[in-house]
Amino acid sequence: IILGDGMADWPVASLGGKTLLQYAQTPNMDKLARLGRTGMLKTVPMGFHPGSEVANTAILGYNLKEVYEGRGSLEAASIGYELQPGDMAMRCNLICVADGRIKNHSAGHITTEEADVLIRFLQEELAKDEQFANVTLTTGIQYRHLLVIKGGDKRLRCTAPHDVPGQEFMPLLVKPKLMEAQPTADLINRMILRSQELL
């Protein structure tokens, strides 16, 4: 299975209304399409946001209503982090904020090596503060990392930074879906703000 995740893109006027993929010379992909099986597939079930983690999990045949936990568990699996009962795992991005606005979602295309220095530093500094005793940050790849909160409540409303470049970040902080999740949302938001102070 070859997934062109995010390849469809939007038509570009200067390319005659074609997308970049339509405009590109793609002899190898053309051959794969000609010799293979192609078709249309609805990869995002009703009620789920159209993220790659949703679509890819559905394509692999999983019932999302039964198994979907968000990106965190996938991030943990990808780096070999073994989650324990009661752990709440979240994808944690390093991003660039300037003048209170999200400049970019990838911390300026940070390398994994550079990110590892920052994530280790943040983990060491946050561990000194009792309020973050149940928080663990683990390095992933480039700007994508893992946040694990022991006893965290996953019923949260989070905004993906890549969806909101140029917007003020404060109104986009984590919000609870239910009041019981307020302590977890508050903890994550304090961690975000403390991380900015430290970095």
Labelled PLM ranges:
Residues 4, 24, 195:
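Functionally constrained cores in energy, signaling, and assembly domains
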Residues 8-127:
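Active-site nucleophile/metal-coordination loop of metallo-enzymes that catalyze phosphate/sulfate
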Residues 1, 22-26, 189:
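Conserved structured core elements
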Residues 71-194, 198:
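A contiguous, mid-domain pocket- or channel-lining segment that forms the substrate-recognition surface
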Residues 1, 38, 144-146:
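Beta-sheet entry/capping signal
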Residues 1-10, 32, 191, 199:
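Beta-strand elements within well-structured catalytic alpha/beta cores of enzymes
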